[in-house]
């Protein structure tokens, strides 16, 4: 009788654990380096997503900025200084985090299905990080 209860308990545990772990947020690792954004995934399911952002640069602060947009990643609207116009046509600013060199931060967001672009919008001594290729397209399904 004890072994039957144990088997039933074990079977319930095996069935419940995947359901509970599927309920948590999607986690995506992001590495920022000199003029580069690398992500462990470029798509995710709609819902809660936590981006674990690490700045691998040794001397530059970077931003991780999320825009919802249908524009190509390399064609976002620019302001007079050459940075992305965060209120420009065709882009909706979602959220952002600034990460000092060698540091890490988490950015938790709830994203509906759609197209997104992640960028660094830092202007460092008239060097626009976005213009140097610091962007990554991202799709939420």
At which residue positions do the language-model features occur?
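Extracellular/periplasmic metallocenter environments
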Residues: 58-59, 97-141
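Beta-strand signatures of extracellular beta-sandwich domains
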Residues: 63-67
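Short aromatic-acidic-glycine turn motif
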Residues: 70-80
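Asparagine-centered strand-capping/turn motif at beta-strand->loop junctions
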Residues: 53-56
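N-terminal edge beta-strand
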Residues: 25-49
């Amino acid at each position: 009788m004890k072994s039957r209860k144990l088997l039933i308990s074990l079977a319930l545990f095996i069935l419940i654990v995947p359901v509970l772990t599927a309920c948590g947020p999607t986690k995506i690792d992001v590495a920022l380096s000199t003029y580069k954004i690398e992500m462990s995934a470029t798509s995710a399911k709609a819902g809660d997503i936590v981006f674990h952002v690490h700045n691998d640069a040794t001397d530059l602060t970077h931003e991780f900025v999320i825009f919802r947009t249908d524009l190509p990643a390399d064609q976002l609207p620019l302001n007079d200084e050459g940075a992305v116009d965060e209120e420009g046509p065709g882009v909706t600013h979602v959220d952002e985090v600034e990460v000092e060199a060698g540091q890490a931060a988490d950015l938790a967001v709830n994203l509906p299905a759609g197209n997104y672009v992640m960028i660094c919008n830092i202007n460092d001594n008239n060097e626009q990080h976005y213009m140097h290729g610091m962007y990554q397209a991202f799709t939420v399904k």
